[in-house]
Amino acid sequence: MSVVNNRVALTNLVSMEALTTEEVLGLINRGSEYKAGKVVISDHQKDLVANLFFENSTRTHKSFEVAEKKLGLTVLDFNADASAVNKGESLYDTVLTMSALGTDICVIRHPEDDYYKELVESPTITASIVNGGDGSGQHPSQCLLDLLTIYEEFGRFEGLKIAIAGDLTHSRVAKSNMQILKRLGAELYFYGPEEWYSEAFNAYGTYIAIDQIIKELDVLMLLRVQHERHDGHQSFSKESYHQAFGLTQERYQQLKDSAIIMHPAPVNRDVEIADSLVEAPKARIVSQMANGVFVRMAIIEAILNGRNKNS
């Protein structure tokens, strides 16, 4: 990975740890340029991309598709339910097939953690891999759009007090964000049910009760309660979770005037956040969705830069 002619060039994008700080900031800046309409878009019709989603998705899937179409790529139709996956074909063989057909980029979401390792290590698969989310592992494109949203607001990361709240153990968003925000100099706090907290997170921030820190926060990043990963073993109701850990009207009133609220969505209204606050003045949830298109344009461009450099 490198920066060529002031533009990021990537072979794959599978995790935030694999990016240098220069590459992270370069992608954020490029996303901002796309958003401002400052980029003259080249003709990429000859470049083929396949979005291989094996978990349900609205924002990530459609955001990538919009980004790809804005860049002029040819987007191959893929429906996992109508593919050979239903005949028992493995992810590896699906990607191997797409690569053999001449696909340049595969954007993949899959329930298995680290699914991408055998793909990027394969000597036969020539398609570049973009991780659209792997199980409870990583979600690099969501992390980058979150960073753009924060940077638009504050113009910096250094010294910001940021709390990541909720279903921490099961959240790929949390894992990607805590790693890079720590590296960029933010002061991180975590809160949520203790059974959803891992001591491994202590390397990045401090576990604390929300009511002890809420008045000092610059960013409150709420996480979706991932019911599908709990096997029905939650120890509390939606109402009790909201009162203990959610953003209630009372907690909202305690936030600084300059503070912002974020959530990767989909939102469980009246669980992580009061229904009336999803579009409140401090909320940036809709901005995150919009920024996703521009950051993903920057990601796809960076992959194409990397492929052109290596060809």
From Swiss-Prot:
Carbamoyl phosphate binds at residues 59-60, 109, 139, 142, 265-266. Its EC number is 2.1.3.2. One of its GO terms (molecular function) is amino acid binding. It holds the Pfam family OTCace_N. One of its GO terms (cellular component) is cytosol. It catalyses: carbamoyl phosphate + L-aspartate = N-carbamoyl-L-aspartate + phosphate + H(+). Pathway: Pyrimidine metabolism; UMP biosynthesis via de novo pathway; (S)-dihydroorotate from bicarbonate: step 2/3. Keywords: Pyrimidine biosynthesis, Transferase. Catalyzes the condensation of carbamoyl phosphate and aspartate to form carbamoyl aspartate and inorganic phosphate, the committed step in the de novo pyrimidine nucleotide biosynthesis pathway. Heterododecamer (2C3:3R2) of six catalytic PyrB chains organized as two trimers (C3), and six regulatory PyrI chains organized as three dimers (R2). NCBIfam families: asp_carb_tr (TIGR00670), PRK00856.1 (NF002032). Belongs to the aspartate/ornithine carbamoyltransferase superfamily. ATCase family. This is Aspartate carbamoyltransferase catalytic subunit. It comes from Streptococcus pyogenes serotype M4 (strain MGAS10750). The gene is pyrB.
